[in-house]
């Protein structure tokens, strides 16, 4: 039997992605065991994040400044805008180091089943940004799911009147992927996105 404080810690940890009740219990135990070296610094870091981290008013990224460091970076290409589902998508793009433009975070995907419509996403602010003559290309980097592709098509339609090129990420065979390990949809997408050598 554990005390109410530890039980609450376990319950909160189990709400994190990838942590079920067992993993949360192990994590809580480790935190309590390493109180001075782990629990106290983690609690301070979480308090600091709760107090200082905010959503960028331009792109939707999380940062301690507004606009965020990406939007404020004058070395980034102002002509390219990458549209992502959420901040996790933005961080994934940044991790590659291959995109040097700016971002627009939608805050989700269209989903009739979940009751998420266009008004629930950052589409209006994206369309307003697309009217900036400095922006010449918008890359739709939504997931290769039904909801992701539905959202991409809707956004592309909304951007059609704007004077920008709208492109999407290629889908298909991952680097190091073998054909016999891929599903039919991935192989079909790879065939459609083929390129000339």
From Swiss-Prot:
<protein>
    <recommendedName>
        <fullName>Recombination protein RecR</fullName>
    </recommendedName>
</protein>
<feature type="zinc finger region" description="C4-type">
    <location>
        <begin position="56"/>
        <end position="71"/>
    </location>
</feature>
<dbReference type="InterPro" id="IPR015967">
    <property type="entry name" value="Rcmb_RecR_Znf"/>
</dbReference>
<dbReference type="Pfam" id="PF21175">
    <property type="entry name" value="RecR_C"/>
</dbReference>
<dbReference type="GO" id="GO:0006310">
    <property type="term" value="P:DNA recombination"/>
</dbReference>
<keyword id="KW-0233">DNA recombination</keyword>
<keyword id="KW-0479">Metal-binding</keyword>
<dbReference type="InterPro" id="IPR034137">
    <property type="entry name" value="TOPRIM_RecR"/>
</dbReference>
<keyword id="KW-0234">DNA repair</keyword>
<dbReference type="InterPro" id="IPR006171">
    <property type="entry name" value="TOPRIM_dom"/>
</dbReference>
<dbReference type="Pfam" id="PF21176">
    <property type="entry name" value="RecR_HhH"/>
</dbReference>
<dbReference type="GO" id="GO:0006281">
    <property type="term" value="P:DNA repair"/>
</dbReference>
<keyword id="KW-0862">Zinc</keyword>
<dbReference type="GO" id="GO:0008270">
    <property type="term" value="F:zinc ion binding"/>
</dbReference>
<keyword id="KW-0863">Zinc-finger</keyword>
<dbReference type="Pfam" id="PF02132">
    <property type="entry name" value="RecR_ZnF"/>
</dbReference>
<comment type="function">
    <text>May play a role in DNA repair. It seems to be involved in an RecBC-independent recombinational process of DNA repair. It may act with RecF and RecO.</text>
</comment>
<dbReference type="InterPro" id="IPR023627">
    <property type="entry name" value="Rcmb_RecR"/>
</dbReference>
<keyword id="KW-0227">DNA damage</keyword>
<dbReference type="Pfam" id="PF13662">
    <property type="entry name" value="Toprim_4"/>
</dbReference>
<dbReference type="GO" id="GO:0003677">
    <property type="term" value="F:DNA binding"/>
</dbReference>
<feature type="domain" description="Toprim">
    <location>
        <begin position="79"/>
        <end position="174"/>
    </location>
</feature>
<comment type="similarity">
    <text>Belongs to the RecR family.</text>
</comment>
<dbReference type="InterPro" id="IPR000093">
    <property type="entry name" value="DNA_Rcmb_RecR"/>
</dbReference>
